[in-house]
Amino acid sequence: MARDEFPGWHGTTIIGVKKGGEVVIAGDGQVSLGQTVIKGTARKVRRLSPGGFDVVAGFAGSTADAFTLLERLEAKLEATPGQLARASVELAKDWRTDKYLQKLEAMLIVSDGKDIFVITGAGDVLEPEHDVTAIGSGGNYALAAARGMMDSPRSAEEVARDAMAIAADICVYTNGNLTVETISA
């Protein structure tokens, strides 16, 4: 089968919600190959602690590529302790300019409890305007749902869980088996 004909790994939904002095990153557990669900219990949200500095990261895209990027992010955080923004920018620069990294197909949401960023292979480090961001195939559904709940009395975790439930109901590449990590500044 030629590379262009390979159906590829599809879908996931990752959301980051900053509210009430904490950040919650949640992700579903579904991994699909074409129209087939391969696994329903994948962990796409991880807690990293390079040099004792806690960061939560969620990823969408190729798992192997995401792990490569998470390792690079950990190295950047060790080189710039406590400076998530700087480490994220350094990772994005490497990702955009390194010939090997340019081929990686993944996106990351990262947070240290104070800041939350989306890091892309295009060299972007984006901080959400409305304290909520989402990536992946169900990202737009989760983002819209969460934005509609941000003024409610729900906690960051409740907003994230409810938004993910809505995304899982709409997006066939997203399931309701969530991994949720909370981090405070």
Swiss-Prot record:
Leading EC class: hydrolase
Catalytic activities: ATP-dependent cleavage of peptide bonds with broad specificity
Residue numbers annotated as active site: T12
Binding site for Na(+): A168, C171, T174
Top-rank lineage group of the source organism: Bacteria
EC number per UniProt: 3.4.25.2
Principal location: cytoplasm
Cellular location(s): Cytoplasm
Protein activity control: Allosterically activated by HslU binding.
SUPFAM superfamilies: N-terminal nucleophile aminohydrolases (Ntn hydrolases)
Pfam families cross-referenced by the UniProt entry: Proteasome
GO molecular function, one term: metal ion binding
UniProt xrefs under InterPro entries: ATP-dep_Prtase_HsIV_su, Ntn_hydrolases_N, Proteasome_sua/b, Proteasome_suB-type
Stated family: Belongs to the peptidase T1B family. HslV subfamily.
Function according to Swiss-Prot or TrEMBL: Protease subunit of a proteasome-like degradation complex believed to be a general protein degrading machinery.
Subunit record text: A double ring-shaped homohexamer of HslV is capped on each side by a ring-shaped HslU homohexamer. The assembly of the HslU/HslV complex is dependent on binding of ATP.
Protein name: ATP-dependent protease subunit HslV
Organism in which the protein naturally occurs: Roseobacter denitrificans (strain ATCC 33942 / OCh 114) (Erythrobacter sp. (strain OCh 114))
Lineage per the UniProt record: Bacteria, Pseudomonadati, Pseudomonadota, Alphaproteobacteria, Rhodobacterales
